[in-house]
């Protein structure tokens, strides 16, 4: 039967079995052979579609991780300047990057890193700027923020400006 990995922690995977098979959740481990064949970064992660074999009423074993259509990877520094890719999530449609307009101010360098990770993993990236009401339009930082937002929009990144106070 097939399912969706909802959570992956310390070698245990919470898998929601497809509705056709009952739609319940199982606590699963990877089949030993699968662990040996795959690198750490390629093990099952949240969002993966998997082939599962039930071993009891509430437990199962993951036999296969099905093909991923998208993913988000975090690069980890390694020895001697090498890097390791740490798979964070799979089969994502959109990555919404949230950053505040102020307190703390938006960090374009960090936003850029997330956008690159999204692009490399075939995920659509977008930016949500929060606390927009907290920055007065005539504040010096507001001009910088407007320029930054305009730059992202110019390169095709959707940007949403929000405010919990005003409902924007």
Spans of features found by a protein language model:
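Structural and coupling elements of P-loop NTPases
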Residues: 2, 45, 95, 122-123, ...
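Structural beta-sheet core signal
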Residues: 97, 127-129
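Canonical P-loop GTPase G-domain recognition
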Residues: 124, 134-168
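Short, well-ordered coil/turn elements that cap or connect secondary structure elements
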Residues: 23, 57, 120, 154-156
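Histidine-anchored nucleotide/phosphate-binding helix
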Residues: 109-119
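Short histidine/acidic/glycine/proline-rich micro-motifs that form metal-
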Residues: 101-104, 132-137
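Residue-level signal for inorganic ion chemistry
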Residues: 47, 118, 130
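N-terminal accessory targeting/assembly segments
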Residues: 1-108
